[in-house]
Design a protein with these regions (language model features):
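Short beta-strand-to-loop acidic/aromatic patch adjacent to the donor-nucleotide binding site
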Residues: 88-98
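Conserved donor NDP-sugar-binding/catalytic core segment of glycosyltransferases
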Residues: 104-140
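Non-catalytic, C-terminal membrane-associated alpha-helical segments of glycosyltransferases
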Residues: 234-239, 251-308
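A conserved acidic beta->alpha catalytic loop
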Residues: 24, 39-48, 69, 99
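Glycine-rich, basic loop-to-helix element that forms the pyrophosphate-binding segment
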Residues: 66-87
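Short, acidic, metal-binding catalytic loop of nucleotide-sugar glycosyltransferases
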Residues: 23-32
Length: 308
């Protein structure tokens, strides 16, 4: 089966990484039919580079979309997928500007897909993701539902001993979407801006079919450490509460709000976690905004803002 695939990459101020990544797609054993780069208003020369890159031709169609402002990963992938759907591609492959594809990443995905039975039950596929330490298990997860809450369980080493296995959640690093899936579920929620957009989209994908992780199709994505910028946590908290409310019964959202409040807003957060008053206030606002659907870029907590 010969399938056409459009690659979508979102970039923001990582020109050095982007150059390396784009070269790797030229080296694929199965070439994409097109590659779309969404530039989230980078300020490091990305605009000029992409204008030259797309005019130089290559082994597939090149397209650069320059946003006038930073739309976050959620907004970037949303407009990238929307543009890809204007073509006649059968699949859309999503990844980051600093995620390096092995030369046969697409070949392996299609090789296993073509051998699978009941292909109509498969909504998306995804790669294994490695970092500098080995397999990065957090990129692929399972969901377990309890009476009041859900648990996300990261994949484990034993899962990767099989040629492929099913997952419930994927990140947008090495995700291969069927065109028919996007036609059914629409685009990622651009109003999430950053964080939880991939989990929310995965949940919609799973409502239409399986997500299959192919273990010998490999992306390498560096682990960036555990340090979190405090302004980002506003979006993490807000979007998680909103996501749970969208896809699970009300009691799950109530539990999610309570859990976030205890960990990030309560006396426990102040005394045990040493969270500042501003940090706790930010998360209180995030919980409320998630509940009522006040999404988009917050006027109070814009990217890069110091919280204190």
């Amino acid at each position: 089966m010969n399938s056409s695939v459009c690659v979508v990459i979102v970039t923001y101020n990582r020109l050095t990484d982007l150059k390396i990544t784009l070269e790797k797609y030229e080296e694929q054993t199965i070439k994409p039919t097109s590659l779309i780069v969404v530039d989230n208003a980078s300020r490091d020369g990305t605009y000029e580079f992409l204008e030259e890159w797309k005019s130089n031709g290559g082994k597939f169609r090149r397209l650069a979309i320059h946003s006038e402002k930073n739309l976050g990963g959620a907004g970037g992938f949303s407009i990238g997928i929307e543009e890809a759907m204007k073509s006649d591609c059968d699949f859309i492959f999503l990844s980051d500007d600093d995620a390096i594809p092995k030369e046969d990443v697409l070949e392996k995905l299609f090789q296993h897909y073509n051998q699978m039975h009941l292909q109509e039950n498969i909504a998306a596929l995804c790669t294994r993701v490695n970092d500098q330490f080995g397999i990065s298990y957090v990129h692929r997860s399972m969901v377990r539902k309890g009476l009041f809450s859900i648990r996300r369980i990261s994949t484990q080493e034993k899962d990767y001993e099989a040629p492929y296995f099913d997952v419930d959640l994927l990140t947008f690093v090495g995700a291969l979407l069927k065109r028919s899936t996007v036609e059914r579920i629409g685009l990622p929620l651009s109003e999430y801006f950053i964080h939880e957009d991939d989990a929310e989209y995965s949940t919609r994908i799973r409502e239409t079919g399986r997500i299959v992780c192919v273990t010998d199709s490999i992306m390498t994505h560096p682990f960036g450490g555990n340090e979190t910028k405090h302004w980002i946590e506003y979006y993490t908290t807000r979007n998680y509460v909103n996501y749970i409310g969208r896809h699970y019964p009300r009691r799950y959202q109530v539990y999610a709000e309570l859990e976030k409040y205890i960990k990030k807003c309560s006396i426990f957060a102040a005394v045990v976690k040493h969270r500042s008053k501003n940090y706790r206030r930010m998360n209180k606002i995030a919980i409320k905004d998630g509940r009522v659907g006040n999404l988009g870029i917050s006027e109070l907590y814009k990217p890069g803002q110091e919280i204190g």
